[in-house]
A protein has these predicted regions:
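Loop-to-transmembrane helix entry
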Residues: 63, 67-68, 96-111, 193-201, ...
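Loop-to-transmembrane helix entry/capping segments in MFS-fold secondary transporters
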Residues: 99-100, 189-202, 308-309, 373, ...
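A membrane-interface helix-boundary motif in multi-pass transporters
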Residues: 130-135, 218-229, 337-340, 430-457
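C-terminal ends and interior cores of transmembrane alpha-helices
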Residues: 138-157, 347-368
């Protein structure tokens, strides 16, 4: 909203009638002045993201912002993207595994993510020396660093050993993710209007980290680089601000019982299990055929024979497109209701999947579009749509979390999403195996992709499971939302910056801060 409009809506009073009676010429001058302000200088446009970050830091603790940057930017963004490219070539060129088998192995990467409720439960009710968040950042960093150094220095090892090390890397990322997500969920409940902004910050950090990771993966194939983000997680565990908990050992059992009882009661609500079921099915039914496609477009005798450097560049451009998707959501879509937004996002998601069929059948060459241009265009479109589809589901998840067990319950919802991703990988692996897609035979790959696209369109029929509410609405009853707030909430995790205003004053303050947001 324009700052002038905000002031009119917030500060308008009956005494403003004199302002409404201004002569036409003065109104024209005021309109011209506002139009001049609207035509912002390049410097002001450049400063908008920094002003947005300043606004978030003023409402949230700055070390929380730093934690989001480290976890989402480095641990998930950089490490996840670099990991994806390097391990794909590792399984293909070093271990020489069939694509359907790689799909099953990649599905095992999601085991630490499926265990997120356990990590969330630990962070909520089992503080270490009085701290609920710091120790788990340290554990995540040490686990990820040791696993990365092992797989990087041991060379070619048995598949079981390599798989264990790679799962260890993803476990470090998952533990760090659930720890920072607990803070995000808590802040999203306490300052509802900032929930979309926090998810936009996560998305931008993740995309920027992915851009760096994909760009470097084509030229630096060493797995040693995967030890860098966990090392910074260790640093984060020492510097992040957290109030020390005063919970006694005898109270931990009570908190655990409250958490389990609260989770059981909340997940049974139709307002919760219906959108959770939709999120699972929307991921599981979109079966993954990535490994079959990867083997095809890097195989010289069948596909376009892309090099590792070009594959990294494709994903890097896709990371830029992901940032564009975040900006599109932040500027135009964050105020739309959940159901209508996810309906159109899923429809576009199915339509973009048909680009893979066109590429595999080489119809792009028939119409004169080179492979390298078409694949980059397809990557950009699919990344933008995927990001627009994904962010509302994360915001929806934060709106379903009750206070006091927000870390545990958000982890449970993310566990459901991880189960959906695991089902997608394994389902895709089974389809690739049934259609006899191997390292050298890709005859039926297009049929597997076509089935995937059909399932994406079929998911639209489940959209009734998504609530119609806006992205700032309370989706669960107030008694459930605050039922667990006595579970050591007074010393829970990362603190918000102290805000003493009443609810009305806080609303006016946020209205004024809207002028600093990315628009």
């Amino acid at each position: 909203m324009d700052p002038l409009e905000t002031q009119e809506l917030v500060g308008k009073s009956p005494t403003d009638s004199s302002k409404q009676a201004l002569p036409i010429s003065e109104q024209d001058q005021g309109r011209q002045s506002s139009e001049t302000c609207a035509r912002a200088s390049p410097l002001s446009i450049f400063m908008e993201p920094f002003q947005w970050l300043q606004m978030l830091s003023s409402q949230l603790n700055p070390t929380f912002i730093f934690g989001v940057v480290v976890v989402y930017g480095l641990s998930q963004g950089f490490s996840g993207s670099f990991f994806k490219v390097v391990t794909d070539f590792y399984w293909k060129d070093v271990q020489k595994v069939q694509p359907s088998a790689v799909q099953l192995y990649i599905g095992l990467y999601y085991i630490p993510w499926v265990m997120k409720p356990i990590w969330g439960l630990l962070t909520d009710v089992f503080p270490v020396r009085g701290y609920k968040r710091r120790p788990y950042f340290l554990v995540a960093g040490v686990l990820g660093c040791v696993s990365a150094l092992m797989v990087a220095t041991l060379g070619k090892v048995p598949i079981a050993v390599a798989l264990s090390c790679l799962i260890g890397i993803t476990a470090g990322v998952a533990i760090a993710d659930v720890t920072i997500d607990a803070c995000i969920a808590k802040n999203s409940i306490e300052i509802r209007s900032l929930a979309p902004d926090m998810q936009s910050l996560c998305g931008i950090c993740s995309s920027l980290g992915a851009l760096i990771g994909y760009s470097s993966s084509g030229f630096f194939a060493s797995l040693v680089l995967l030890a860098v983000p966990p090392t910074i997680l260790i640093v984060l565990g020492f510097v992040i601000y957290e109030v020390r908990s005063t919970t006694l050992q005898s109270e931990k059992k009570k908190d655990l019982q409250i958490a389990l009882r609260g989770m059981s009661k909340t997940i049974k609500l139709p307002q919760v299990w219906k959108p959770s079921l939709y999120m699972y099915l929307s991921l599981a039914l979109s079966i993954s055929t990535h490994e079959g496609q990867f083997y095809w477009y890097t195989y010289p005798k069948a596909g376009p024979a892309f090099s590792q450097e070009f594959v990294g560049m494709i994903y890097a451009v896709g990371a830029l497109a992901s940032i564009a998707g975040v900006l599109i959501y932040q500027k135009t879509l964050k105020d739309y209701p959940f159901r209508s937004l996810l309906l159109y996002a899923q429809l576009l998601y199915g339509m973009t999947g048909m680009l893979d069929v066109i590429f595999f059948l080489r119809w792009n060459l028939v119409i004169g579009i080179p492979d390298y241009f078409f694949v980059i265009m397809e990557e950009c479109v699919s990344r933008i749509i995927s990001r627009i589809r994904w962010i509302p589901m994360i915001v929806l998840s934060t709106r379903l979390c009750p206070l006091g067990i927000e870390g545990t319950f958000f982890a449970l919802l993310m566990c459901i999403d991880s189960l959906g991703s695991l089902s997608s990988k394994w389902g895709g692996g089974i389809v690739l195996h049934l259609f006899h897609v191997t390292r050298t035979d890709f005859t039926n790959l297009w049929l597997a992709i076509l089935i995937r696209n059909f399932l994406r369109f079929a998911t639209i029929g489940l959209i009734f499971l998504v609530p119609k509410g806006d992205q700032e609405d309370d989706l669960i009853p107030p008694d459930i939302l605050t039922a667990n707030s006595d579970a050591s909430l007074d010393d829970d995790g990362l603190e918000l910056a102290p805000v003493k205003e009443t609810s009305e004053e806080a609303r006016l303050l946020l209205d004024e801060e809207n002028s600093l947001k990315l628009k």
